[in-house]
Curated annotation (Swiss-Prot):
ATP binds at residues 137, 308, 367-376, 378, 400-403, 426, 454, 460. It catalyses: gamma-L-glutamyl-L-cysteine + glycine + ATP = glutathione + ADP + phosphate + H(+). Its cofactor is Mg(2+). Belongs to the eukaryotic GSH synthase family. Mg(2+) binds at residues 137, 139, 371. Binds 1 Mg(2+) ion per subunit. The gene is gshB. This is Glutathione synthetase. Substrate binds at residues 117, 141-144, 211-213, 217, 267-270, 452, 463-464. GO terms for molecular function: ATP binding; glutathione binding; glutathione synthase activity; magnesium ion binding. InterPro entries: Glutathione_synthase (IPR005615), Glutathione_synthase_a-hlx (IPR014042), Glutathione_synthase_C_euk (IPR014709), Glutathione_synthase_N_euk (IPR014049), GSH-S_sub-bd_sf (IPR037013), GSH_synth_subst-bd (IPR004887), PreATP-grasp_dom_sf (IPR016185). Its EC number is 6.3.2.3. It comes from Dictyostelium discoideum. It is an enzyme of class 6 (ligase). Homodimer.
Amino acid sequence: MEEKLNDLKEQGIDWAFANGLIMIKKPTEEEAKNNVVNVTHVPFSLYPSKMNKKLFNEACKLAEDYNLLVHNISKDYDFLQNTLKDVFDDFTQMLLNIQRKVVKEGIKQKISLGIFRSDYMFHNKIEGEEERIYQVELNTISSSLAVVSNRVFNLHKYLIGRNDLNDNGYDLLNHPTNQSDKEISDSIALAHKLYNKEKSSVVLMIIQEGERNIYDQKGLEFQLWSNHSIKLIRRTMKEINQCAKLDEENGSVLIVDGMEISVAYYRAGYTPNDYTSSGGDEWKARLLIERSLAIKCPTIAHHLVGVKKIQQVLAQPGVLEKFINNDKESLQRVKRSFTGLYSLSKEDIDMSVVKEAIESPQNYVMKPQREGGGNNIYNDQVAIALKSMSSEELSSYILMDKIMSKSFKTHVVRDRQLLEIEGLYELGIYSVFISNGDDDIVLNKQAGILLRTKTANSDEVGVAAGFGLLDSPILE
């Protein structure tokens, strides 16, 4: 058995390097000083993980529901501003300020592109209780890993077929197709064609400095060119502030290094760490893009819908109905996906829930308003934070019931090492959405799958952040 697993490991590593399932390793100080770049495979499971088919399909069905929900909320300027005005978080307040400015000036571009990902965990706290899915979070900006997720699905198909594992419980008929890379690049291409002001325009990908997950991003760039003959350029926000301008005579066209931008696609800008210049260069770039005619992915409104406070407020009685008011089935599906979500803002904090969380912190998670992995508070730290933070500090978090999943044994490969772990997984469903103004919906569809597995004793699951690894499901 061990010999077979090692053989699978070597086959998997070779396939990963040959097919772009790779990322840049974090450099040592010496390597950084000498500009040495080392590449490794993205951590992956050796074979697919078993998953409840009914719940998988339920998660996929929710994709279009959440797309419409994000769209409807993004149209309600007053709801976003009023709901988030008391969030004690400078980052969120800066986003709100940009929205106020561009709405006052008048939105230049009616077309918007959304590339979203809704993440779910499978809840089964009590033995014998029916398993169900709960939403962990909804990502409305920089929904990454679509390219490498496609690769790990193909890796598993290769390993199963190559090693005759179909009879070992890994029937490829139960292994879903995942074209997340193509679906997302196609949506960017469609937005580019809708812009269609100048045939020589290009797509702008806004990136972080020192990006290690570059090959996931490059995969989209290559697909845009090979499938659609569309050029993509990459710039950091600091670079954009230096080299971008608006051509006011032509309706606020965004020009970067002399090139007209059709779509501004953010793979950065979701964390305060992306806005560090003392002169506010990155915030100036964000405002410039938002003021422009370029199609934004996301718009500032779409970004704000992803703030955790919105997730918490939607779970309150009567709120969701304002935004899903003509489809009872959709309303019930979305409601069913909500776990317990509680405000920590001083205006509406529920002290009985806070007291319970202090007494049983292992049953709760504190989540900050912003996106990006590694910022949540778990276990005993929840009680410490609730007791020590000021009311202003608490308002920058929400409290959430911890989703309890059953763990399973699996074999994984990280840094060329074969490991047996007790794992848990998180299922992400990509979706794409294009609207031309408030009421003209051009595209609304599910756009692929991301399955990330982590060790059962790990709280976070981010792959780029170093917590999780890529997986794929076998449905049963």
